[in-house]
Amino acid sequence: MDDILIVGGGIGGLTLGLSLHAAGIPCRIFESAAEIRAVGVGINLLPHATKELAVLGLEDDLSRVAIKTRDASFFNRFGQLIYEEPLGRAAGYDNPQFSIHRGDLQMVLLDAFKSRVGADRIFTDHHCTGVEQDDAGVTLHFPNGQSTRGRAAIACDGINSVIRKQFFPDEGEPRYSGVNMWRGVTRWKPILSGASLTRAGWLSHGKMVIYPIREADPGGLQLVNWVAEIETPKYRRRDWNRAGSLDDFIGAFADWHFDWLDVPAFIRAADSVLEFPMVDQDPLPRWSFGRVTLLGDAAHPMVPRGSNGAGQAILDTRAMTSALSANADPVAAFAAYEKERLEKTTRIVLTNRTNPPDAILREVYQRTNDKPFKAIGDVISHDELVALSDSYKQIAGFSREALRA
C-alpha cells in the first residue's frame, strides 16, 4: 500500500495523521493500547504549537475543553512574588497558550482523526515489535506473526520507542535528571487569576508547578494540575507513572501556607498522586534510516521543564508534512525533515537540562541563599528577569517575532 505508517496514537501520532490527511497524504496509525482513553494529567501548549493546531482547524474544539492561560508567576518558597508576565494572547501572540488535561487533548485529536480520516485508519491493540524495509516500502511487525506494509514508517511511540531501540540498541535506559516528580490534579477554587501558570520554590528544597486545566464547575471549582519536584540523587527503577505516596514528598511543602494558596491542603485534596522520575535521553546524531524515521518523544525526549514536549512533537508534524509534500521519495523527505528539526530540538533538550524557564527560581534561590527578601529589586533586576524568560522563548522558537516571521 502507499500509506505512511504511523507507530503510536499519542499526541504526536494523531496530530501527524491529521496533518498528513490535510495534505492529501494517506496514512494509518497503529497504537499499542487496546483502547485510546482520556488518561494522564495536565500539559501546556505554547503558542507555536497552538498555531499549528489552529491551522488544522482545532482551536475552537480545544478552547471548549482547555484554559486559555493568561499569565505566568514565579514565587520563592516563602510565597513572595519574584516575577510575572502575560502569556498567550494576553502577551500579544496571535494564538493562545492552552493549559489542558492530556486526556482532553487526546480525545479532541482522536475524534478529529476518526471523523476526518476514518475510524478504520487507526488500529488499536497493535504493538509494533519492529520494522523492516526494502526498496519498495516497509513492513511493520506485530505479535503473533502479524504484519502490514506501507510506503514508509514514522515512529511516534514515545520515550520507550521500540523503533528507536531497534536503531540504537546500545543506548540504554532514559537518563535520570536527579529530580523526582509527583503529579496530581485537585478540584480547587481559582488560584491567582484563575488562568495562571505558577512556579514556586526550587528543586533543592521542593518546587511546585501549578495551573488550571478545566474551567470552573457549577460549584466554582476548577480542575487544577500540580507537579511537585524534588532533587533526589537516586531513584529505584519502578513502574513509570506509578501510584505515589503523599508521605514521600509533602513534608517539603509543610509550611507553604501563602495568602494566595494553602499548598499542603491543596496537595492533600488530590484524588490520587502519580510518581515518576524526570528523564530524557541524550540527543541522537540522526533520526532517519531510509524509509523509517522518529518523531516527538521517540526522537527527542526532553525533561518537562519548559512546557514544550508535546509542542515540539506538534512542530515535528508540520515539518514532516511539508517534507513529504515536497518530496515523493520518503527517504529524501525524511532527510529534509531531519535537517529542519534535529538541531533545533537538540538545543531545546540541552537547554531544558540547564536553563529552562524556572532558571529564574534558581537564580533567586542562589542569590538569596534561600532566604526571604525585602524587595525583589534588591536581588535581581527586572531586566535580568525579562532576559532569562526571553532567552528560553528564543531557543524554543516561540518568541512573538519568530512566530510572525
Please report, for each region that a protein language model flagged, where it lies by residue:
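Short helix-loop capping/hinge motifs at secondary-structure junctions, enriched
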Residues: 188-194, 216-218, 235, 259, ...
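A short coil-to-beta-strand element that immediately follows conserved catalytic motifs
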Residues: 178, 193-197, 223, 258-276
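Conserved mid-domain beta->alpha element of the FAD-binding
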Residues: 5-24, 28-34, 154-155, 182, ...
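C-terminal helical "tail/cap" subdomain of flavin- and related membrane-associated enzymes
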Residues: 1-2, 79, 285, 306-307, ...
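Short glycine/proline- and charge-enriched loop/turn segments
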Residues: 31-34, 87-93, 231-235, 317, ...
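Conserved N-terminal helical subregion
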Residues: 2-4, 21, 46-168, 172-185, ...
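Active-site substrate-recognition segment that forms the wall
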Residues: 75, 196-235, 253-255, 278
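Acidic/histidine metal-binding catalytic segments
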Residues: 64-65, 121, 255-271, 330-335, ...
